[in-house]
Structures are given as structure tokens and as C-alpha cells.
């Protein structure tokens, strides 16, 4: 490929602390009425002084450890100065000169195999407020409203090196990061609610000439799919400009979900534009070795470690293990099921197909469903005893999922118990053979597909309730024994 994208990400993770970064206002503000979770500190009233949230610092250290970062025992807060309607203080408290962590990495499944994406820095900062645009899209809004509730909500910003080589890799990185912060319990990672936000910097290299375009920042990507789509669009836009012999402007662009394009928002700021200087009202953060060891002990088994254990303990393929461990709750559900039904691969197949389909259709997590390990124990027992076929099991599963009823109850209510009476099935097959000697002759002359006729006959006569495995066995025995 002649043109190659070079992508770096700046990710904001909203921390699930009880209170905001520097005041006692609640941090969970998503569903609150506008401007109801504010105080003099988070709205920048004169004389109000910030007090750092210790839980915020602990969450940042946990995340840094999970991302293989170097933790700095000494870090400091700084003021990032800029004007925007949703920033009442006129500056944002962040960490610029001395971040809490640097030099980490996250391994992802890249386009050409396993790939380490380096993390340049991880630092703490407070969130700004939120602009609500009144109109059908950001470009056609007639006016905007400001909600200050989000001001002061604690964030960690994670900045990667430009190691990402495609829009798909950017999406994969984001998905894996969300999985990690959820495992840690430091964030919900919900992009639609703004708990995980991604800005991407993209430039394009012409591999034939070595020429590289200006860097463009892309914002407003509030789903993993939009991260990929926005970067695909921007890559194509930059390539077209380069093919015309032009260069794109160094600017910030926003993804417009309605038009499926990026639109210019403003010129790209340089770091000097923010006039960073040390925050005079907050002392430095000093971490002891004992504190770091204490936090390290709190780390749970993370997705990669859990996937390796699933492969080792349950003899699962790598793909299955990664899908099952992508969500902490799904992994826990799988292990609870294995305790009840010790058939890991069969359970994995059901969870990865039937369960995930039902969850995705409803856009819910496994913890929000009525499904329990006992449902699988009951379902597998019905199949093992020959009472239902796998086809019937899959047909009743949506109802099991929706209602929480036991499979055996649904089977009984609907009269779905399959017929496993060997004598009855044998009589039906013999009857079919007597009535259709040509199909018998076809089978004997090598046309094995002719057996399907007899299967169909038995299923029609039993209204689909005949045990298919037993039926096939009897058909084969009678046809080959003639």
C-alpha cells in the first residue's frame, strides 16, 4: 500500500469515584438535571480552593500498573489555560510537567499479528463542562447550551505514541483499553455516556516518496465503530489531497454522525498556546513504595492473564478465550457455568453464539439478563437424555433468555419432547421404503443423499419431533441391511 496512516490516540477515561477530582460534588452526573451538581470549587468562584481526591490518585496508579507504565513517585498538577464556554475557571487542572506515569504499552491484535502500542504518558486532570448543541447536527445547531455538571469530574488522559497503523487497530486498542478499565473497576468505559472519549491524531505517509502530511486531530467519536469510520474517512480525505499534490491544514476536525464526514472545528493548538504553569493551590503528589505495593496487590486478574488461564485450564482455543474474557462479567458467568456443567468447550460455543447474540440484540450486559448457569444445566440435560435436539434447544433459547423460564418448562408447555421410540421410528422408515422403492434404489446405487428423503418423511410424520440422530442411524441400518 502506497499510503500509510500514522495514528496516535489521546484517550480520556472518566473515573468512577464517588466525588469529583477537587471538591465534594458527586462525580456520577450523567443522568442529573443540568447544572445541579456544581459548587464554588468546580465552577471557579473566587476564593474557592481545590482538595485532591485520594481515590482518583489510586485509580490512576492502578490503571498505570495495568498498562505497564513507569509510575512516578513525585507528580504535580498544572494549569492548562484556554478559553471555552464550558470551562468556567478559564483553565483546567491537569498534569503537564510531571505526570503520574509514563513509558507504558498495551499489546493488541494488530493487522499483522501481536503488536505493542507504546503509551507516552498517563496523567490526571479534571473534566470540562458539556456543550449541548440544539439542532440536528453539530454543524447546523442554531444555538448551544452549557451544562457545568461535568466540570471537575476526575479523568485520566492516556496518550499513545503514533504506533497505530490503521483505523481498525485504533478501534481494537480502544476496545481492549475499555476491557481493562472495567476489569479494574476504575471506570464504566461507556463511550455513549462520555466515560471513555477518544481524540485521534492522524497523518499519512507516502511510502514511495517519504513525504508525510500535516497532522490532523479528529474529535467527537463516541463509539468504537465511529472511531474506525472517522479515521477511515480522514485517511481517504488526506490521501486524495496528497494525490492532488496538496497538503491538508493542521487543524482539529469533528466527526459528524449525520453526514458521516469530518468537519473543520478550529486550527490545531500548539502546547505553548495553553501557557501551562504549576497549580499553586495543590501540593505535589508523593507516592511511597509501600503505597505502590498496596495498590499493586489490589490488581485483579486482567483480560490477557485470564485468557491464558482459560486456554490452559479449560483447553479452549485462543479465539474463544479472548472473546469470553473481553468482559469481566462474561468471563465470570462462563466460570460459574463450568462449575455446574463441566463442559467448557460446549459452554463456550453456546455463550459465544446464542448468548452474545441475545445480549447484542438487546444491548445489555450478561449481568442484566435473567440467564443463570442452571439454565444451561437444564438445557444440556434435555439434550443428553435425547429429549430435545440441538435444533430445538436453539429454537427455545431466545424464550429462555427473555423469560428466565427453565428450558424443561418451555419444552413441556410446548410439547417439544422429541420421540426416541426406536420401534416407532423403525416402522415409519420401513413404511417410507415400501412406498418409495426408487429412493431405496437410488441410495443403493451410491446416491447417499437419497437418505434425506426418508429423514424428511419421518420428520413430517412426527411433526419434527423424531430424534434426528436416532432417525439417521435407523435409516442407515435399514437401507444398508436390505
From Swiss-Prot:
Disulfide bridge map: none
Record GO terms (molecular function): asparaginyl-tRNA synthase (glutamine-hydrolyzing) activity; ATP binding; glutaminyl-tRNA synthase (glutamine-hydrolyzing) activity
Pfam families linked to this entry: GatB_N, GatB_Yqey
EC number(s) reported in the record: 6.3.5.-
Reactions catalysed, as given in the entry: L-glutamyl-tRNA(Gln) + L-glutamine + ATP + H2O = L-glutaminyl-tRNA(Gln) + L-glutamate + ADP + phosphate + H(+); L-aspartyl-tRNA(Asn) + L-glutamine + ATP + H2O = L-asparaginyl-tRNA(Asn) + L-glutamate + ADP + phosphate + 2 H(+)
Gene3D superfamilies: 1.10.10.410, GatB domain, N-terminal subdomain (1.10.150.380)
PROSITE patterns given in the database record: GATB (PS01234)
Superkingdom in the source lineage: Bacteria
Keywords: ATP-binding, Ligase, Nucleotide-binding, Protein biosynthesis
One annotated GO biological process: translation
Task of the protein: Allows the formation of correctly charged Asn-tRNA(Asn) or Gln-tRNA(Gln) through the transamidation of misacylated Asp-tRNA(Asn) or Glu-tRNA(Gln) in organisms which lack either or both of asparaginyl-tRNA or glutaminyl-tRNA synthetases. The reaction takes place in the presence of glutamine and ATP through an activated phospho-Asp-tRNA(Asn) or phospho-Glu-tRNA(Gln).
HAMAP family: GatB
Membership in a protein family: Belongs to the GatB/GatE family. GatB subfamily.
Subunit structure: Heterotrimer of A, B and C subunits.
UniProt protein name: Aspartyl/glutamyl-tRNA(Asn/Gln) amidotransferase subunit B
Species annotation: Thermotoga sp. (strain RQ2)
Amino acid at each position: 500500500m502506497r499510503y500509510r496512516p500514522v495514528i496516535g490516540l489521546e484517550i480520556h477515561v472518566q473515573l468512577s469515584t464517588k466525588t469529583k477530582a477537587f471538591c465534594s460534588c458527586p462525580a456520577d452526573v450523567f443522568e442529573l438535571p443540568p447544572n445541579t451538581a456544581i459548587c464554588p470549587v468546580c465552577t471557579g468562584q473566587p476564593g474557592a480552593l481545590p482538595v485532591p481526591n485520594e481515590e482518583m490518585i489510586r485509580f490512576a496508579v492502578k490503571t498505570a500498573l495495568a498498562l505497564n507504565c513507569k509510575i512516578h513517585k513525585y507528580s504535580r498538577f498544572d494549569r492548562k489555560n484556554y478559553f471555552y464556554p464550558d470551562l468556567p475557571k478559564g483553565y483546567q487542572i491537569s498534569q503537564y510537567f510531571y505526570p503520574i506515569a509514563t513509558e507504558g504499552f498495551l499489546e493488541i491484535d494488530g493487522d499483522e499479528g501481536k503488536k505493542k502500542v507504546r503509551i507516552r504518558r498517563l496523567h490526571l486532570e479534571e473534566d470540562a463542562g458539556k456543550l449541548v448543541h440544539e439542532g440536528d447536527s453539530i454543524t447546523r445547531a442554531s444555538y448551544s447550551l452549557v451544562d457545568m455538571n461535568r466540570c471537575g469530574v476526575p479523568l485520566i488522559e492516556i496518550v499513545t505514541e503514533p504506533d497505530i497503523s490503521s483505523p481498525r487497530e485504533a478501534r481494537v486498542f480502544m476496545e481492549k483499553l475499555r476491557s481493562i478499565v472495567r476489569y479494574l473497576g476504575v471506570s464504566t468505559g461507556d463511550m455513549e455516556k462520555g466515560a471513555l472519549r477518544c481524540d485521534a491524531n492522524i497523518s499519512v505517509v507516502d511510502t514511495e516518496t517519504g513525504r508525510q502530511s500535516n497532522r490532523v486531530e479528529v474529535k467527537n467519536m463516541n463509539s468504537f465503530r465511529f472511531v474506525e469510520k472517522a479515521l477511515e474517512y480522514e485517511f481517504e480525505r488526506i490521501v486524495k489531497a496528497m494525490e492532488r499534490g496538496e497538503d491538508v491544514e493542521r487543524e482539529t476536525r469533528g466527526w459528524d454522525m449525520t453526514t458521516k464526514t469530518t468537519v473543520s472545528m478550529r486550527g490545531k493548538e500548539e502546547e505553548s498556546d495553553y501557557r501551562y504553569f504549576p497549580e499553586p493551590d495543590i501540593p505535589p503528589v508523593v507516592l511511597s513504595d509501600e503505597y505502590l505495593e498496596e495498590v499493586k496487590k489490589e490488581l485483579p486478574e486482567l483480560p490477557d492473564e485470564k485468557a491464558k488461564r482459560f486456554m490452559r485450564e479449560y483447553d479452549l482455543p485462543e479465539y474463544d478465550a479472548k472473546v469470553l474474557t473481553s468482559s469481566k462479567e462474561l468471563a465470570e458467568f462462563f466460570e460459574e457455568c463450568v462449575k455446574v456443567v463441566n463442559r467448557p468447550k460446549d459452554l463456550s460455543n453456546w455463550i459465544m453464539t446464542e448468548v452474545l447474540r441475545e445480549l447484542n440484540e438487546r444491548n445489555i450486559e450478561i449481568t442484566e439478563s435473567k440467564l443463570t448457569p442452571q439454565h444451561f444445566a437444564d438445557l444440556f440435560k434435555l439434550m443428553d437424555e435425547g429429549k430435545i435436539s440441538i435444533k430445538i434447544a436453539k429454537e427455545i433459547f431466545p424464550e429462555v433468555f427473555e423469560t428466565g423460564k427453565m428450558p424443561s418448562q418451555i419444552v413441556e408447555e410446548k410439547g417439544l419432547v422429541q420421540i426416541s421410540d426406536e420401534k416407532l421410528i423403525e416402522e415409519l422408515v420401513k413404511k417410507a421404503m415400501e412406498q418409495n422403492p426408487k429412493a431405496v434404489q437410488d441410495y443403493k446405487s451410491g446416491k447417499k443423499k437419497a437418505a434425506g428423503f426418508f429423514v424428511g418423511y419421518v420428520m413430517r410424520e412426527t411433526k419434527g419431533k423424531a430424534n434426528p440422530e436416532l432417525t439417521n442411524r435407523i435409516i442407515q441400518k435399514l437401507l444398508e441391511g436390505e
